[in-house]
Amino acid sequence: MQQKALTKKLKNFTMNFGPQHPAAHGVLRLVLELNGEVVNRADPHIGLLHRGTEKLIEYKNYLQALPYFDRLDYVSMMAQEHAYSLAVEKLLGCEVPKRAQYIRVLFCEITRILNHLMAVTTHALDVGAMTPFLWGFEEREKLMEFYERVSGARMHAAYIRPGGVSQDMPMGLSEDIYKFAKQFGSRIDEIEDVLSSNRIWKQRLVDIGTVSAEEALDWGFSGVMLRGSGIAWDLRKTQPYDVYDELEFDIPVGTKGDCYDRYLIRVEEMRQSLKLIMQCLNKMPTGVIKVDDKKISPPSRVDMKDSMEALIHHFKLYTEGYSVPIGETYTAVEAPKGEFGVYLVSDGSSKPYRCKIKAPGFSHLQGLNFMSKGHMIADVVTIIGTQDIVFGEVDR
């Protein structure tokens, strides 16, 4: 009897991580089942940022639905506008002018750098390195300025639209992007100097959150999470859209599938994006930036000041929208976080019948349980950082 009393009763400890935890990157509520300091189970509770985007889109016409895509993953805005615009264009069957395609690709790669700078530097901040975070935001500020000059908004640009882009690049912007691209390589080097061979950084990332190639495919991972496990799948190469098939770039691939591999891939992807930006600036042709179809493209501001017909045309287009032929399409782009897909169904009216959004972060968050099992609490923070999760797109 006394022996039984002395036997220590083991009981797992349940802890709430978030939703107001600084390392949760938004509104993640994570219920952790702990054995001491080791994680037995991680149960993510999502939906705290659910806004009913997919339903709201059904009440808007095709052009009015576009700004919702900026607000999903609010770190990589134009990549999502791109997916939606491509989907609408596929249903309309329209061919986008070459210049518009180059501008789109240029800004999608600027968006990729914006996203990866945020991902790598906030990941470092979570692990305890403050300096790269401050450097990264200095560079992001310059890129945000390019967004602002081209669209008028720093974040929610609504710049890439079905049929092309909303307006041409202003004078001098190409030169400034070129100047940025020339100096940004050395900024990446600085971040790498501080992190890549740093002993503490490697101790916190190497062999943490390992994902095998089979697991990555089974859980539906995409983007960096898939390439980190050794699978060279990038939609820009495998299913090229716009002018990606005319540009040269490499796909960085990991070997071990741990947090460190994914960090290295993000850094290398920033370098590849620089390469693509340079090619876009060099190859960009002159010409129009919208489809020459008056049913889809609004008239220019200059025409609206001169012509009453143009003003009426603009008003009708923005209030009633345009009808899209009956059909359905699934269109995906390689967003910075992974495969961002739009399943769009048209019933022939001016509003989408259904718009299903496939967000990459949703699949990645599902894998948090198996990735953090057997690791310490501190490593959960590292794993959330490496998954690069933004809740706007997870909860939608």
Curated annotation (Swiss-Prot):
Enzyme class label: translocase
Catalytic activities: a ubiquinone + NADH + 5 H(+)(in) = a ubiquinol + NAD(+) + 4 H(+)(out)
EC number: 7.1.1.2
Localization per Swiss-Prot or TrEMBL: Mitochondrion
Gene3D superfamilies: Cytochrome-c3 Hydrogenase, chain B
Covalent S-S links between cysteines: none
Family annotation (SUPFAM superfamilies): HydB/Nqo4-like
Pfam families: Complex1_49kDa
Keywords carried by this UniProt record: Electron transport, Mitochondrion, NAD, Oxidoreductase, Respiratory chain, Translocase, Transport, Ubiquinone
Molecular function terms, GO-annotated: NAD binding; NADH dehydrogenase (ubiquinone) activity; quinone binding
Protein purpose: Core subunit of the mitochondrial membrane respiratory chain NADH dehydrogenase (Complex I) that is believed to belong to the minimal assembly required for catalysis. Complex I functions in the transfer of electrons from NADH to the respiratory chain. The immediate electron acceptor for the enzyme is believed to be ubiquinone. Component of the iron-sulfur (IP) fragment of the enzyme. Component of the iron-sulfur (IP) fragment of the enzyme.
Protein name: NADH-ubiquinone oxidoreductase 49 kDa subunit
Gene name of this polypeptide: NAD7
